[in-house]
A protein has these predicted regions:
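N-terminal signal-anchor transmembrane alpha-helix
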Residues: 1-54
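Membrane-interface segments at the starts/ends of alpha-helical transmembrane spans
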Residues: 82-86, 112-126
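Alpha-helical membrane-embedded segments
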Residues: 123-143
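Short, highly charged, low-complexity non-transmembrane loops/tails of multi-pass membrane proteins
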Residues: 147-168
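Generic alpha-helical transmembrane segments
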Residues: 52-73, 92-99, 129-132
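C-terminal halves and exits of single transmembrane alpha-helices
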Residues: 90-117, 134
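Juxtamembrane "helix-exit" motif on the non-cytosolic side of transmembrane helices
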Residues: 41-49, 73-77, 104-113
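Membrane-helix interface/capping segments
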Residues: 70-85
Length: 168
């Protein structure tokens, strides 16, 4: 390998490092979307025990989580940040979680979560899980705002890496 080939390999390596660092800005969003996807899939499956119109909510959330995942992967290698579907999904997840938190303490509990017994312990467990999901959703909304405003730590690392690679 001559000097020119080594320089080209080094340039490609730096370019890939920059691309990956920029894409890592969305890492926590991708993890939380995956968590919500599997949680909502589980909710769809338990709705088959006693099918009702309630099944529409987890199905909508699953569809939006798939669309948000596709949106995330389309961002790889692009400098533009468009998180419209992801933001819509996270907001929808937060709204539905808030509604479910309230409905957990009503007679709707057994329709929403037919695998749980209608007792205080089950309601508290479901309430805590829903509350954790709501907190994650709210943190995701904040993270998206930070990304749009370029206030996220990952963007600062990207800028530092970009500056250091320009100096080489």
């Amino acid at each position: 390998m001559d000097k020119k080939e080594r320089q080209e390999i080094e340039r490609q390596r730096r370019e890939t490092a920059l691309k990956n660092t920029f894409f890592n800005r969305f890492l926590l969003l991708r993890y939380s979307i995956a968590l919500f996807f599997f949680g909502n899939i589980y909710w769809v499956l338990i709705q088959f025990i006693r099918p009702s119109l309630v099944m529409i909510f987890p199905i909508i959330l699953v569809v939006f989580s798939i669309l948000a995942t596709v949106e995330q992967f389309r961002l790889y290698g692009k400098r533009s940040v468009r998180l419209g579907i992801t933001q819509m999904f996270v907001c929808l997840q937060a709204i539905i979680s808030t509604g479910l938190l309230v409905l957990t303490w009503t007679s709707w509990f057994t329709y929403l979560f037919p695998i749980f017994e209608n007792n205080q312990l089950a309601r508290v467990f479901v309430f805590i899980v829903l509350l954790l999901g709501l907190v994650i959703s709210l943190l995701d909304i904040r993270r998206i705002q930070d990304i749009y405003q370029q206030k996220d730590k990952a963007f600062q690392r990207y800028i530092q890496l970009e500056k250091s690679s320009l100096n080489l």
